Amino acid sequence: MPDANKLYLPLKRYFETKTAVTLKDFDQADREALALFYDARLGEPIWVSKSGYNSSADSLIAEMKKADDWGLSAVDYKIPALNKPVAGDPNEDDLAEAEIKLSLAAMQYGREARGDRIDEPSTQLSSYLDRKPQLIARPKLLEALSAAPDKGEYLRSLHPKHAQFERLRQKLIAMRGASAADEFEKIPDGPKITVGKVHWQISLIRRRLKVAVPVTKPDAPVFDEGFYDDALAKAVEEFKTKNDIEPVNPTITQALRKALNRDDRPDERAILANMEQWRWMPSDLGSTYINVNIPEFTVRVIKNGSVIHSERVVTGKFETQTPIFSDMMRTVVFQPSWNVPESIKILELLPKLRAGGNPLEGRGLAMKRNGHDVDVWDVDWEKQDIRNFHIYQPPGDSNVLGIVKFLFPNKHSVYLHDTPSKSLFNEKVRTFSHGCMRVRNPVQLAEVIMAEDKGWSKAKINELIGSGPEDNDVALDKPLPVHVTYFTAWVEDNGELKTFPDVYGHEQRIKLGLEGRWNEIVKNRDHLLPPEDAPIARSRDDWGDEDGPPPPRSRPARYSYREEAPPPNYRQQQQSYRKKSSFSSFMNQIFGN
């Protein structure tokens, strides 16, 4: 029943008569949800009174105008003007139009604050980006917004609350507020400069490396900024070490100048792309969780916001990328066997078997059928289906999974595991696997996980590894969240902004998606679909998992893709590694995961 003391507007009539003209550019689902919302309110407005916008509208509009500070675009939200006539109040039609359009703008902001600009990353960008924004249903969003005492505060609450999102946001604000004096100034060619010398470039190098000018006593001579002192020398050596510049000494060289002239500062687009990814992350990462950041090639165990363990990892090749997703680790397996994936059976082993060879010999592989050992020479491979044979590598020093693996069941069938190919961890770009993540010191990771989950000691872990049973599955008492991420920009606790290479091209795809340049995005082929030319459909254990195939999955009637070229220098890095690797380690690249 309408309240005689409240304002009611003919909003239903406005929706029925004006949608095709004045509301056609707004999201249809937003319009439909808003019409039902106002119908339930009998046309009672939120934002206007008889004289114009009320205080709730003022709070909402003020916050929406700050959208750029949150990684959104303020110009995308069309805030309707509501000018008061010279005499009297605005008419009902003007009030109704302002009310509805402001609500629609607020709904758009609310959706996009939660990540709706790219609402299906796995289909819009790449099937490897298995993330989905945590959107709020439109009716719930409207109810919460209308009930919130502070409308601006409610809009702010919709953004990610992760500390890293806020750190990136502050970097974005600072970047946009930088003055002309902060422009990147290149260091020209010059002579070698050693410690103790004076040269005008020293002051420029000092600023680039953020080394402060020494403070002198009041009665001492003013310090010459061109003097090459010990503090700067230490920073130069650290920079050379970090950037692989040889020899590592304090001498200023052309190689050092060239490295210092690389403007590695991320642009706004890179910051925005990383902020957007945080909108896709779970709101609760877990009190203790594992994070594998692909561009950084690093796995971390994080407890109560602090890193308690960190280690290097090897990730998937460009052609067999490690997917980006979250799931729950449930099992740690000590002394695991490796079950050869069906794709490798058919594409790698079967041709050699049919040619009369024995590709299992020398690689530590064994074969069974129906639980019984089988000799490859006793099988007519022209007639038999190799998929009916269990080909595996028993536990041992040469096993491609090493001595431990960490399972978090997922549709991509990837996991963390050990590897005998330890030399790969010395590479700077470590994209060498079939999709799984190899850990440099997996026993230490197991020790941390088991200490947190079961209170086990290092001695207990060593006992399991040394004398425990093979394929020893140890279920975790409490499943542990695992977040595989793709952050190319990260702000450290000290405020330092670190950047990492866009090894799979996802950062570029996100940039283009945020700018609406969808036709410029080159997608990866959907790695979960059967390959076009393979003899069989790709099954779940194609990645090396032993869990059996997934339910059948049909190919969409219309599916097209363009193969994307790998990032610059990717082929050279792969070729460089293969030239210097041994034959056995190279075979681990073919048969390992």
Regions found by a protein language model. Give the residues of each.
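Well-ordered beta-sheet/strand-loop patches within structured domains
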Residues: 1-28, 100, 104-108, 127-132, ...
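Cationic-aromatic interfacial patches
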Residues: 1-134
